[in-house]
């Protein structure tokens, strides 16, 4: 149980560092578009990555340690690029998020008498207008996960590397704990953002979110640089 909890805490600490994947989950939650598909992609990707990390950390470290250095520098470039994009969006100060809301009948007094007429609340614009609105967010989640060098660093260096010290059985318990953190985190963030979509869709709020993301990503990039 102690090994499981240790993996859970490490997984949570990695998730708390807001990266491009988490930003996508938040944005799609606010838009209420394809959030379930995005969450499923994130969870399935973590299963595969954590499994690969647990299986392959020793092999990579022993046979091709330069691969980890390449991943580290690619990760630095990736983080800094997204930090610049977030800072740019914050400076533009015009980020607006459109979310979906179903129209509801509203009773209103009729001007001609005591009757009641039915008005429709304005329907907020739906960005896609197709039933397959989840496809693009799902593809974005795949790209931001599998083309993110830091995902491999997390899997091989942190999950695989730290878990290896617990032995053959313990490392899988450790990886299960790390995945449990993902299992809680992504639905909580995605559906939580959907529940708070109205206040979070404000341009002022997103300006500060983008500033925070830029600062955090820059800090993570500096941390990776210092690891060398």
Curated annotation (Swiss-Prot):
Membrane-crossing segments per the record: 3-23, 37-57, 66-86, 139-159, 172-192, 208-228
Keyword terms of this UniProt record: Amino-acid transport, Cell inner membrane, Cell membrane, Membrane, Transmembrane, Transmembrane helix, Transport
Annotated compartments: Cell inner membrane
Main localisation: membrane
GO molecular function, one term: amino acid transmembrane transporter activity
Topology within the bilayer: Multi-pass membrane protein
Matches recorded under InterPro entries: LeuE-type, Lys/arg_exporter
Highest taxon listed in the record's lineage: Bacteria
Entry-linked Pfam families: LysE (PF01810)
Record's GO cellular component terms: plasma membrane
Annotated signal sequence range: none
Family, similarity comment: Belongs to the LysE/ArgO transporter (TC 2.A.75) family.
Function: Catalyzes the efflux of L-lysine.
Protein name, as recorded: Lysine exporter LysE
Phylogenetic classification of the source organism: Bacteria, Bacillati, Actinomycetota, Actinomycetes, Mycobacteriales
């Amino acid at each position: 149980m102690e090994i499981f909890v240790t993996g859970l805490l490490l997984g949570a600490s990695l998730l708390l560092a807001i990266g491009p994947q988490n930003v996508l989950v938040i944005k799609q939650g606010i838009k209420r578009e394809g959030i379930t598909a995005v969450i499923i992609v994130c969870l399935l990707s973590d299963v595969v990555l954590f499994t690969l990390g647990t299986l392959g950390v020793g092999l990579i470290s022993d046979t091709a340690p330069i691969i980890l250095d390449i991943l580290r520098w690619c990760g630095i470039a990736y983080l800094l690029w997204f930090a610049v994009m977030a800072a740019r969006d914050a400076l533009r100060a015009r980020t607006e998020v459109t979310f979906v809301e179903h129209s509801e009948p509203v009773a209103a007094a009729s001007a001609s008498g005591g009757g009641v007429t039915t008005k429709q609340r304005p329907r907020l614009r739906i960005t896609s207008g197709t039933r397959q609105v989840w496809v693009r967010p799902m593809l974005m989640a795949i790209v931001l996960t599998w083309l993110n060098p830091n995902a491999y660093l997390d899997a091989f260096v942190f999950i695989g590397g730290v878990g290896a010290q617990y032995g053959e059985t313990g490392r899988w318990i450790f990886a299960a704990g790390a995945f449990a953190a993902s299992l809680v985190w992504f639905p909580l963030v995605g559906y939580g953002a959907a529940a708070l979509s109205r206040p979070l869709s404000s341009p002022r709020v997103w300006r500060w979110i983008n500033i925070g993301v830029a600062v955090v990503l820059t800090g993570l990039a500096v941390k990776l640089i210092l690891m060398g």
